Amino acid sequence: MGLHKLRLAAAVPVTFSSRLFLKPFTNTLTLGLFSRHLQPRNKPLLVRAFSASAAVQDIPATQTSDSSVAARPLWKAAIDFKWIRDNKEAVEINIRNRNSNANLEAVLQLYENMVNLQKEVERLREERNNVAKKMKGKLEPSERERLVEEGKNLKESLVTLEEDLVKLKDELQHVAQSIPNMTHPDVPVGGEDSSAIRQEVGSPREFSFPIKDHLQLGKDLDLIDFDSAAEVSGSKFFYLKNEAVLLEMALLNWTLSQVMKKGYTPLTTPEIVRSSIVEKCGFQPRGDNTQVYSIDGTDQCLIGTAEIPVGGIHMDSILLESALPLKYIAFSHCFRTEAGAAGAATKGLYRVHQFSKAEMFVICQPEDSESFHQELIQIEEDLFTSLGLHFKTLDMATADLGAPAYRKFDIEAWMPGLGRFGEISSASNCTDYQSRRLGIRYRPSEPPQTGPKKGKANLPATKFVHTLNATACAVPRMMVCLLENYQQEDGSVVIPEPLRPFMGGIELIKPKHK
């Protein structure tokens, strides 16, 4: 059985350096099984003008044009272009507030071109049908010959315009998919510093002795081995040892047990998914600063969060209203390139390439998504309060929202070793942004039958569901919090009481004596 060579696509800084490399690189780095490569950005498709009408206009100058042709999209989002056109000002402000690079003018111009071209196609189809009808009657030979020639010309023109229409629709999708979700009206406008505190729980622990960070604690207690992992896998990988392994399992099992009590169905997920699923969930699997590892030579990626495979479970489906809400708590390993991450604030377990996480995911009716968002946040806050953490919940500002999020709350916990708060979870309401891309709809309960005949035509129209996601437990950062906050003067670490039954009754991680 041959060994497949994986080349993991991830944008890296040009100034990247590592002890593994002796000279600068350009496009591709090969690390035995793994490598990272830079993807060229797709150039906009040149829309071919048609001579039968002036419906197709030039794309705005902000759209770069060259001789390259954008690849046809492998999937299409059900974007409401008419709504975008009718609410241009609101969409424009939203794009600006979120610091998005979406090109609204290009989208609107392409949409207008498409509408005009569709009208022209429909006009030619009607003319061709009229010619066909005339051909059925009794005609003089000369008239029949003229109609045959006219029908032939119309067919050729129609084929050309239909090809143009397909290309125009593809380019419209290509450009429009960069438009972010709209934003909740209560979200603060600005950068991360503009985020509003929803609440703050507890207070920083006061230590009467010099404190250690989790790296030193992990070394002294023989819990974490970064050096061996760096030799085996590279930087930002780690081994957990001894009680740290039990602590990870305890965190996950306790979290799952608590969240399941709220009616969430437990899942484990695939950790390799198709790139299209990553894109449909609102992540960029390739390009500058991607956080996604792509498997070269395939259409697959390693997941950065269980949100992605869980979102794909009901892809291209119509759910019954009675089946909603669907609430999941999913365990997975997560893989992130952490491109651009550096500095003391990201050292140790705080920012790593591979980690375990439990993720909550909700599929619901649109009118229920805000209440489920509050439920997710409350579950997170209850979990962290039970573990005795000092944390604050932030309503994140517009510029800190990812493309799918309508609103996002982050929770930051106090990390004594860092001397600051660090993010440990987030909860996002993505409304119908993901469902329009994943094709997840539901059919409202059928109203009383009033017509004489019951049939498909009488069924209520389907609607797009809303999706939400929230972190229940990101293991490495939770371990940072617990090790640093529960350290004792003698070098030991106390295990929070809720976790002890899941660690065989262990109450204390003690220094190892050689």
Curated annotation (Swiss-Prot):
A GO biological-process term: mitochondrion organization
Enzyme Commission number(s) of this protein: 6.1.1.11
Disruption phenotype: Lethal. In heterozygous plants, aborted ovules.
Residues where ATP binds: 336-338, 352, 423-426
Name of the top EC class for this enzyme: ligase
Molecular function per GO: ATP binding; serine-tRNA ligase activity
InterPro entries: aa-tRNA-synt_IIb, aa-tRNA-synth_II, aa-tRNA-synth_II/BPL/LPL, Ser-tRNA-ligase_type_1, Ser-tRNA-synth_1_N, SerRS_1_N_sf, SerRS_core, tRNA-bd_arm
Catalytic activity, reaction form: tRNA(Ser) + L-serine + ATP = L-seryl-tRNA(Ser) + AMP + diphosphate + H(+); tRNA(Sec) + L-serine + ATP = L-seryl-tRNA(Sec) + AMP + diphosphate + H(+)
Protein location: Plastid, Chloroplast; Mitochondrion
GO CC annotation: chloroplast; cytosol; mitochondrion
Binding positions for L-serine per the UniProt entry: 305-307, 359, 471
Keywords for the protein's UniProt record, in alphabetical order: Aminoacyl-tRNA synthetase, ATP-binding, Chloroplast, Ligase, Mitochondrion, Nucleotide-binding, Plastid, Protein biosynthesis, Transit peptide
Pfam family, one: tRNA-synt_2b
Pathway(s): Aminoacyl-tRNA biosynthesis; selenocysteinyl-tRNA(Sec) biosynthesis; L-seryl-tRNA(Sec) from L-serine and tRNA(Sec): step 1/1
Family membership noted in the UniProt record: Belongs to the class-II aminoacyl-tRNA synthetase family.
Function in brief: Catalyzes the attachment of serine to tRNA(Ser). Is also able to aminoacylate tRNA(Sec) with serine, to form the misacylated tRNA L-seryl-tRNA(Sec), which will be further converted into selenocysteinyl-tRNA(Sec).
Oligomeric form and interacting partners: Homodimer. The tRNA molecule binds across the dimer.
Domain free text: Consists of two distinct domains, a catalytic core and a N-terminal extension that is involved in tRNA binding.
Protein name: Serine--tRNA ligase, chloroplastic/mitochondrial
